[in-house]
Design a protein with these regions (language model features):
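N-terminal [4Fe-4S]-dependent radical SAM core
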Residues: 16-19, 169-227
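Conserved SAM/AdoMet-binding glycine-rich loop
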Residues: 2-7, 115, 259-371, 401
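Flexible glycine/acidic-rich beta-alpha junction loops that bind and position SAM and/or redox cofactors
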Residues: 14-15, 124, 233, 245-246, ...
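Short glycine-rich His-centered loop
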Residues: 2-34
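Radical SAM enzyme core and accessory elements
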Residues: 2, 6, 55, 74-78, ...
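Glycine-rich beta-alpha loop elements in corrinoid/cobalamin-binding modules
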Residues: 41, 48, 57-186, 421
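Catalytic cores of alpha/beta
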Residues: 125-132, 382-398
Length: 595
């Protein structure tokens, strides 16, 4: 019997029996429209509590349901017994799937406890705890240690009043919300993601099907370096903005991972893959000294993998020359949101002129950048249908200037299906959004709509839901034509997207489903050149061998009743904001409306 089984649900639990047109809600992410890619925190929780002696397992229920038509989640979960079942509700599009999974677990294992966690769970914890199938909710962005304390209290038969960040129900049904006091200032004690844990689990326990991050990952793995928890920017529509983290997690500034820990993650990734490594967050967050340590370390590693960097504001030739001197192959991802400088500034990222954007692109290519992906968004504050269509003209301008290189790729996607809870767009009506869903139950119901346009739970003062849908199709049509003209996509890919958009406009759901979910962009357009499958190395063998030694240690510790021997001590005081390099959010974007 396990102490904890962590579960990742699909977006809609019975999607295989439903006829839904999910549209382009997942076209620019690696996973399918069931959002079968689990949050990185699930692996760090599993790794941390296991290191402290507890038996834990992670099951990507959503991925297995997507990839394996014969997979029966009820039969599988009936066989897996645990004291606590932890269900991820981090991203709000999992609202229906997470709650349905909680109800299934409570029916199959009524004497076990159902735990919910993630940022969306944090926001809606008071509503979640009233759900009969939910016994516990852990709040915040770093619940590794609170989860361990919860399991320790249950093992010792103690009351749960001392577990930080916990909302729970007593046996008589009384709801208790313990103080939310745990927000570690540093997160080096946790593996984010816990690649070594995943590799050991697969090698020693054969849990490959349960642990694959999303469908297709095994063939073309994309790995991640997590720079920090939290952010320095105030992007209006982002539930991971500075004010959202302050509101939901009590975090005054990001908790950065040290360059040394990032480099250790990189070595682990190299042990099993030569595929691209994506760094989440702008690497300049945290200051120049931290950036220098990271780049110096990368130069010493001489890693063969391509590094994909995310930029939040313009960069100059000096920065790119440092990057080029540190890694052999590197690419960029830029989220511009809009060509309109005022709209872009109001939302948060790249609050600068278009000339500065183009100067950044030019400097990056001059320094040897392999590819640059530029993302535009439909539905940012103040954006009209006409403004969205004008973005296509700017895309053409970018390709006129850089298209001959065939290394600039342009994408567009709507804010869909929901506004992020805790974001300024969700909280502040002054930004011009009109919410059509307020409660978790509202969002759960919206996910059952037959068409993605009806699933949208908002419109703006500038665009109706129908206009957001049409703007998405129209902008993507233009980008698709530009990609063909400039040799960035094949005739077959162009034709497939034309057919997809035509079917979308006609609301033709024939063949719709999670394995056929790329309507606006063919999925092969999102693949990074050079992606390769898994490959064994001596370091991988060493990781597995040390994992076996660790497994024997854990077995002995459990037999002797010795638990909680590797407790993290990261502190809870947030570092001062002086560590922040800069925030390009305008003054109006720094308002932090109270919940």
């Amino acid at each position: 019997m396990y102490d904890l089984i962590l579960l990742h649900p699909p977006s809609v639990f019975d999607f295989r029996a439903k006829r839904q047109f999910r549209g382009p809600i997942a076209d620019v992410i690696p996973s399918t429209d069931q959002f079968d890619m689990y949050a990185l925190g699930l692996t760090s929780i599993a790794s941390y509590v296991e290191a402290n002696g507890y038996r834990v397992r992670l099951v990507n229920v959503g991925r297995r349901m997507v990839a394996q038509p014969q997979y029966d989640p009820e039969a599988h979960l009936r066989r897996l017994r645990a004291r606590v079942y932890g269900i991820s509700l981090h991203w709000l599009p999992h609202a229906q799937g997470a709650l349905a999974l909680a109800r299934l677990i409570k029916r199959l294992h009524p004497s076990s406890l159902v735990l919910m966690g993630g940022l969306s769970s944090t926001y809606f914890h008071e509503e979640l705890i009233r759900e009969p199938a939910v016994d516990l909710v852990l709040r915040g962005d770093s619940t590794e240690e609170p989860t361990r304390r919860l399991l320790a209290s249950l093992r010792r038969g103690e009351a749960l009043d001392s577990v930080p960040n916990l909302t729970w129900k007593r046996f008589d049904g009384q709801v208790v919300s313990n103080p939310q006091t745990y927000a570690p200032a540093a997160v080096d004690a946790f593996d984010l993601p816990a690649y070594a844990y995943m590799l050991r689990s697969v090698a020693l326990h054969g849990h490959l099907d349960d642990l694959i991050p999303y469908e297709g990952w095994w063939r073309r793995p994309l790995t991640v370096l997590l720079n920090a928890r939290g952010c320095v920017l105030e992007c209006a529509t982002c539930g991971g903005s500075a004010s959202a983290y302050a509101r939901l997690c009590g975090r005054a500034s990001p908790a950065y991972r040290s360059p040394e820990r990032l480099l250790d993650d990189l070595r682990t990734i190299r042990s099993f893959s030569r595929s691209p490594i994506f760094m989440v967050h702008d690497p300049r967050m945290g200051g120049g000294a931290r950036l220098a340590r990271l780049l110096d370390g990368l130069a010493a590693e001489r890693m063969p993998n391509e590094l994909v960097l995310e930029l939040f504001w313009p960069a100059d030739a000096t920065f790119f020359e440092r990057v080029a001197a540190s890694v052999r192959r590197w690419s960029l991802q830029l989220t511009l949101d809009s060509h309109d400088e005022a709209l872009r500034t109001g939302n948060g990222k790249f609050a600068c002129s278009n000339a500065e954007v183009e100067s950044t692109i030019e400097a990056a290519f001059a320094a040897g950048c392999r590819n640059i992906d530029v993302f535009f968004t439909v539905g940012v504050p103040g954006q009209t249908l006409a403004s969205t269509l004008a973005t296509a003209d700017y895309c053409e301008r970018l390709l006129e200037r850089f298209g001959h290189l065939r290394r600039l790729r342009l994408f567009a996607a709507p804010i869909a299906p929901f506004l992020d809870p805790g974001s300024r767009a969700f909280e502040d009506p002054a930004l011009g959004y009109r919410r059509l869903a307020t409660t978790l139950a509202d969002h759960e119901s919206a996910l059952l709509e037959a068409d993605w346009g009806r699933t949208l739970t908002f419109h703006s003062d500038a665009m109706t839901r129908d206009e957001i849908v049409e703007a998405t199709y129209a902008l993507t049509e233009r980008i698709n034509d530009l990609n063909l003209r400039y040799g960035l996509s094949s005739a077959a890919t162009h034709a497939a997207v034309v057919v997809g958009i035509g079917r979308a406009r006609a609301r033709d759901t024939a063949g719709a489903g999670p394995l056929d979910s790329a309507w606006m962009f063919a999925k092969d357009e999102m693949n990074w050149p050079g992606s390769e499958g898994i490959r064994p190395t001596l370091r991988l063998a060493w990781i597995i061998a040390t994992g076996l030694v660790e497994e024997l240690r854990l077995i002995a510790s459990r037999a002797l009743g010795r638990y909680d021997g590797r407790v993290a001590d990261e502190g809870v005081a947030a570092p001062p904001r002086s560590a922040v390099v800069r925030s390009d959010a305008p003054a109006a974007s720094t308002r932090r409306p109270s919940r």
